[in-house]
Amino acid sequence: MSTLRLEVPVPFKLRTNKIHFLILGGGGNGSHLIHNLTRLVKVHMDRGLGEYLITIADGDVVEEKNVTRQNFFLPDRGRAKVDVLANRYSRSHGLSIGTIREFIEDGKALLKAMEIPGFFPIVITCVDNHKTRKMVNEVYQQHPERFLWIDCGNAEFTGQVNVGFNSSRKLQEGESQAGMFKLPSVIEVYPEILQTEDLFKSEESCDDLGVRNNDQNIATNVLVATEVFVMINQLLSENGLSTYMVKLNAKTGEVAAKKTTFSNLKDF
């Protein structure tokens, strides 16, 4: 009689505790993410567990329609989203949060924004267009092991989070020690993204933005941002990251995780 053998995930663990988080997008997912990310960073820094910097990039201002679904309040209207978020959480937790008051839409701007001497970049794309993902992917492919890429996205009730690391070192069968190895990016998991034709946020019309805003659900945004936070919390822990992809459904409450096992990663 054969027995099923449970495959244990091999933790992905960074070699440094000096990290720069660059969040692209301060809307539905990004504004909720920074709420918990700043708390996590504050706890780790107070305990002497690492040095962390946070930068948020977004070219939008807060509108009344953002107040319900996104992490903003009525008095925030008319102000730059990045300024609202940076001021709120830097004052709350005594952190210095960098701001970029524009959309990052080309590779040179991305490299300039992520690079801070001595700090390893983690780029978090909280965007609702594939053109930005394709731009980030070009930099990701051209600069192996330069940064970790966390992407999150969602439809009305479904969402996903994906952690990618471009490395020639693949996880080997039978390997068990935590370390850094290749994790598939959102583009590798969903290669059809490369065939899409959409616009950068700065190129969209008012009609485009209105349709997109109405397609979102507040529960989905909160859950997606929470899953990103959970994965970052794992990543910064002593044990490392054991999940590289999560799919969720805000209507049913279902969450499905892909673990960092040889079987899951061998084909990427």
Predicted regions and their residues:
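Localized chelating/binding microdomains
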Residues: 2-5, 12-15, 81-83, 89-90, ...
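Glycine-rich phosphate-binding loop and adjoining beta1-alpha1-beta2 segment
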Residues: 50-95
